[in-house]
Amino acid sequence: MLTPVVSYSTVREVKGPLIVIEKTRGVSYGEIGEVIGPDGEPRKVQVIEVGTDYAIAQVLGGTLGLPAKGSTVRFYGKTLKMPVSEELIGRILDGKGQPRDHMPLPPPEDFRDVNGEPLNPYSREYPEEPIETGISAIDGLYTLVRGQKLPIFSGTGLPHNMMAAQVVRQSTVRGSEEEFAVVFVGVGIKTEEALFFMDEFRRTGALRRAVAVLNLASDPVAERILAPRVGLTIAEYLAWQLGYHVLVVITDMTNYCEGLRELSSGRGELPGRRGYPGYMYTDLATIYERAGKAHGKKGSITQFPILTMPHDDITHPIPDLTGYITEGQLVLSRAMWGKGIYPPFDVIMSLSRLAKDAIGEGKTREDHKDVANTLISAYSKALEIRNLATLVGERNLGWRERRYLRFADAFEQKFIKQGYYERRSFEETLDIGWDVLSILPEDELTNARPQITQKFYRRHIFESVKL
């Protein structure tokens, strides 16, 4: 049990999730303590601002019923640390790292600062090994790479929660399943969403290799800021100390940024773009940059954050700043979802900057780059022909153009679309890719190497298509 270093009874103000303490001396940024109200109930606090004779602390347990008068604050001279253990795998925690599954925490093997220790850029290793998610649109076109940070840009009402659950359930590093773990972090999610994730993880057995950190929308806003850091602290211990390949799925980073804006407003800071704090880019980087691989370390941390774009606006500060820090983005399309396609990826708007180095012979399959490049270029051309067909009519198109229309339909319905419980291997994904590409004439596949086309092209499919 921690011994208080200093106590203050000079709480000047309780403002939202924050308290202002006057006449402080020697209190440090990030220091933890507790505030005790007249009712005698202790609530954990963390210092987020230090002045010449004052300090501002966020109350992690919320300030409901906490008056300024009669409250005492104790500081311990330490930063917030998370007790970590391999036995956390299979557990469900709240945003503070406390049990949400009504079981005691396992004996700690170590205590880790929740703010983490940034990787020295010189010690970082370039990510080059793929993670198989079992989702064709990701594995085939925008492969997730071990050590990468690849966000999903979604919108309100789109099935990003289903995708998050499917990725947690299906993802694996081939050949090292026993060393693979998932850390799922729900940030500011509704009770209904939390029940969905808990039921899904337990029912499908995904929880056996996962740690779930669930912060609810009804929890204090300070916990919303803490939840991703708690999850990443557990991931860092599993990766750097125990050698696990850890996939961290965080949803929804928009809720995190809204919490950041609320805390910033409570502190009276000057707002930046659309009311968000000017340091939001730096703050997001402290989360996203905790992904990666390190020389001499067996494990890795891969981040798969999910955010909902307000009003589907990809230029909004949250997706805009996220795109600067991360290595690509997977964009969900409302139009595809309206056509009944799950997962509803916008193929043209999506990008994975590291995929090219993690696919091919010895990693996935020799034809992977050829399939990915050809599918994207052919689909882009097919969309242009679709627009043309709405103007002149399909009957007035040439036979090649009509082939592209058949290809686009098959690509969306057979390659992109798949079942929620359907898991496809890399080989199955690439085979489906060749099935839909073979609708086109062989001489149209100019983005694939001739020897690859000759080996994998299905001429019988080309001949069976009716125009």
Swiss-Prot record:
Per the record, GO CC terms?
plasma membrane
Could you name the domain of life of the organism this protein comes from?
Archaea
Q: Which UniProt keywords apply?
A: ATP synthesis, Cell membrane, Hydrogen ion transport, Ion transport, Membrane, Transport
One Pfam family from the UniProt entry?
ATP-synt_ab_N
Q: Which GO terms describe its molecular function?
A: ATP binding; proton-transporting ATP synthase activity, rotational mechanism; proton-transporting ATPase activity, rotational mechanism
What PANTHER family would the database entry show?
Answer: V-TYPE PROTON ATPASE SUBUNIT B
Question: What interactions and quaternary structure are annotated?
Answer: Has multiple subunits with at least A(3), B(3), C, D, E, F, H, I and proteolipid K(x).
Protein's UniProt name:
A-type ATP synthase subunit B
Q: Which organism is it from?
A: Pyrobaculum islandicum (strain DSM 4184 / JCM 9189 / GEO3)
